[in-house]
Design a protein with these regions (language model features):
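Carbohydrate-active catalytic/glycan-binding domains of CAZyme proteins
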Residues: 2-326
Length: 326
């Protein structure tokens, strides 16, 4: 067994191998930093991509196999930790049966319960179910136990993310109302359910693929438009409080193909530990006809010292030296 070549640079759109030399398979993913280690969770897409014969739009799919987990100290070299949440193959009625849809898994750590809580978009093959699913584990690498799927506060939930604020309160952001409006759902103290308080934001603006982060005293949401697997313009929005009013700032991407988000779609924003004002914007470059070979586009966010304006410039190759040390 030969140790694979170490990754020295981020190379967006290129095949990105794990420490064993296999392509990283963690799509629509999210990153958790816990006790000195980053954990990357994503859709584990294995096997042939098919277009169902009854499809009325390009809903290319692979069977659900589960949610993969990778670990890293440096964000560049990732060790495959296995499938942290496995599809339930012996119960055809399960939300996470191979015939169903499981997308955009995000894991947060609950300091009170000491549990790792995974939220995900679960759906029927025709995307009519529009629910959120929740699973929990005692360890970051799993195994995660699937708890339940539901419509948060009785409303549709498709593309989604979870954000934990500095005070320990968690929120689920989800594309609701036929993907036309973003719902921000506050969660219970154990992070496993909505607590009943929610707001409707970006009404009628059809934003998907939310990624939320905090910089200074402000909250930011990066999102995409709503064009299926095909790329569109990214958009950044800002708020003084999560449940407050959000202001659209426009497209932060710059460089070639910026108006198409470099052919990517947002999935997460990583705060880089030990660096000042350092965030990585993570995008998926979907290959709709071969979803397993969808690539990743990770790019550094640039924050202007004077104006606090955030841009995401294209880099074909970069490393963490672009950020200043704390």
């Amino acid at each position: 067994h030969i140790q694979a070549q170490k990754n020295e640079f981020f190379r967006p759109k290129e095949v990105w191998n794990d420490t064993e030399g296999n392509p990283i398979n963690a799509h629509g993913g999210g990153i958790l930093y816990h006790k000195g280690t980053y954990y990357w969770y994503g859709e584990y897409k294995v096997g042939k991509t098919v277009l169902p014969s009854d499809a009325t739009w390009e809903r290319y799919r692979t069977d659900v196999t589960g949610v993969s987990c990778y670990s890293s100290k440096d964000l560049l070299n990732w060790k495959f930790e296995g499938v942290a949440l496995k599809a339930i193959t012996d119960d055809p009625n399960s939300d996470i049966h191979p015939t169903q849809v499981l997308e955009r898994p995000k894991v947060v750590y609950n300091k009170k319960t000491k549990k790792f809580v995974m939220w995900m978009h679960i759906d029927s093959p025709d995307y009519s179910k529009a629910e959120a699913g929740v699973a929990i584990a005692d360890s970051p690498t799993g195994p995660f136990k699937y708890l339940d799927g539901f419509r948060p506060n009785g409303t549709m939930s498709r593309d989604q993310t979870v954000f934990v604020d500095d005070d320990g309160t968690a929120y689920q952001f989800s594309s609701s109302e036929e993907n036309q409006t973003m719902h921000i759902n506050r969660l219970t103290e154990d992070y496993t359910k909505p607590d009943g308080k929610y707001v409707r934001r970006f009404v009628g603006m059809a934003r998907e693929a939310p990624a939320v982060f905090k910089h200074g005293n402000k909250y930011y949401m990066l999102s995409s438009g709503c064009t299926g697997w095909d790329p569109n313009s990214a958009e950044l929005a800002v708020a003084d409080s999560i449940m407050g009013e959000w202001t659209v700032l426009g497209d932060p991407c710059t460089g070639p193909d910026a108006e198409k988000t470099f052919y990517g779609q947002s999935t997460f924003v990583i705060p880089v530990q030990g660096k000042k004002n350092a965030f990585i914007a993570c995008f998926d470059m979907w290959k709709k006809k071969d979803l397993q070979d969808s690539r990743y586009i990770w790019l550094p966010m640039m924050i202007d010292k004077q104006t606090n304006k955030i841009t995401i410039p294209w880099h074909a190759e970069w490393n963490l030296d672009v950020f200043k040390k704390k």
